[in-house]
Amino acid sequence: MEAISLFSPFFFITLFLGFFITLLIKRSSRSSVHKQQVLLASLPPSPPRLPLIGNIHQLVGGNPHRILLQLARTHGPLICLRLGQVDQVVASSVEAVEEIIKRHDLKFADRPRDLTFSRIFFYDGNAVVMTPYGGEWKQMRKIYAMELLNSRRVKSFAAIREDVARKLTGEIAHKAFAQTPVINLSEMVMSMINAIVIRVAFGDKCKQQAYFLHLVKEAMSYVSSFSVADMYPSLKFLDTLTGLKSKLEGVHGKLDKVFDEIIAQRQAALAAEQAEEDLIIDVLLKLKDEGNQEFPITYTSVKAIVMEIFLAGTETSSSVIDWVMSELIKNPKAMEKVQKEMREAMQGKTKLEESDIPKFSYLNLVIKETLRLHPPGPLLFPRECRETCEVMGYRVPAGARLLINAFALSRDEKYWGSDAESFKPERFEGISVDFKGSNFEFMPFGAGRRICPGMTFGISSVEVALAHLLFHFDWQLPQGMKIEDLDMMEVSGMSATRRSPLLVLAKLIIPLP
């Protein structure tokens, strides 16, 4: 299905209609204009703005995180864009982010409450990622930490991850000996991550699996859709006019119906004591039935959390794997080094298990370096300022949205050196910099109260997939294609995925068990 984008002619028609309506309803006096100019002067610096649209035009024609990085280099590490009717503050330096997280994390702990996609697909704030800060969010966050994705439960999913990874290597081995051996690795990795998530969420006997994944893929196609109402909150009807709202609600309605069927199946299995595994949906249903939460867990809550895990967790994990393989193919010395380490550490064993992964220290460095160059969310999920505060000497008004440009932080030469744009896993040797939120120059999963609750779960899937791919196979580009021909540009959506799929040839080196 076609999504409305910044490049759609219909978008511009709708946008200019919005401008016309805004002009009709706008009331201002000379005194209010003067007051607005005084307030504007105390905001962070801004690129030149156009009437009514503000800085929207400057974000057209490229990936927003790259455009914002260039704007930061011109106008400073903390800038304020006017996107329609919304003030959007963008932090692009370690110093700015450190001040925000250390001094004002609570003031920036909120999420925008009226974003069209999250309002519809996350059931109007019934999960964690896009839920506004407050008691209900704290409860949901605790459920994630204590019940759903704690280290013990993530480890309990090891057998599922290993089984899915072995099936993936089997499919790749089969394709490697086919008449047309070129493999779309991006597609296969995405299918693998989907399979892991659906099994830990619903089990391997989910009758609706294929249809559900089809709907999730359709939902993901709308993530980067441009919502006029997100930038003009007073003109929400424009999303109805463009057809975006009806498309989102149509896909969501189908997903909601599938959720109802899956919940009914799991409830029947639990009642008959036929549930073979303690799945994510089982845990949530038990919490709902116990009814001892301050904020009651409802069927809507259950569906919102599972939806969140799928939409926020599948594409991000698969994109990390995709980028690791891309960087290793483009850097054959690093590829040789990581494979040599793994194959020597296995000492002749052919069956790789998760318990072997801690032996692969260079793989850990490779993953870190890939997360630095290709953070899955280059622009962290937007926050909203709960009360007016001062950051780097500038006033950030209550209600302003905040974007942290993780892409810019991880390319800051002040912290990463003059070779910050280069793939160099060795830069992480002997240093304590990690991605768990304490190092502001490297925060692909966020930091503070809003750090990603599924980080451990996602990284575990990434590690087991890469370990199997690199241990069993040698990789190269299709015949006639040179390393310098490999497209390394990204497109923005729920995460920054490859602009073009990774097409490769695989050669089986270590026999499959």
Swiss-Prot record:
Q: Which Gene3D superfamilies match?
A: Cytochrome P450
Instruction: Specify the protein's topology with respect to the membrane.
Output: Single-pass type II membrane protein
Q: Catalyzes what?
A: alpha-humulene + reduced [NADPH--hemoprotein reductase] + O2 = 10-hydroxy-alpha-humulene + oxidized [NADPH--hemoprotein reductase] + H2O + H(+)
| Keywords from the named record | Glycoprotein, Heme, Iron, Membrane, Metal-binding, Monooxygenase, Oxidoreductase, Signal-anchor, Transmembrane, Transmembrane helix
Its top-level enzyme class, in one word, is oxidoreductase
Which Enzyme Commission numbers does its entry carry?
Answer: 1.14.14.113
UniProt record, GO biological process: sesquiterpene biosynthetic process
Give the matching InterPro entries: Cyt_P450 (IPR001128), Cyt_P450_CS (IPR017972), Cyt_P450_E_grp-I (IPR002401), Cyt_P450_sf (IPR036396)
Output the Gene Ontology cellular-component terms.
Answer: membrane
The name this protein goes by in its record: Alpha-humulene 10-hydroxylase
Q: Lineage of the source organism?
A: Eukaryota, Viridiplantae, Streptophyta, Embryophyta, Tracheophyta
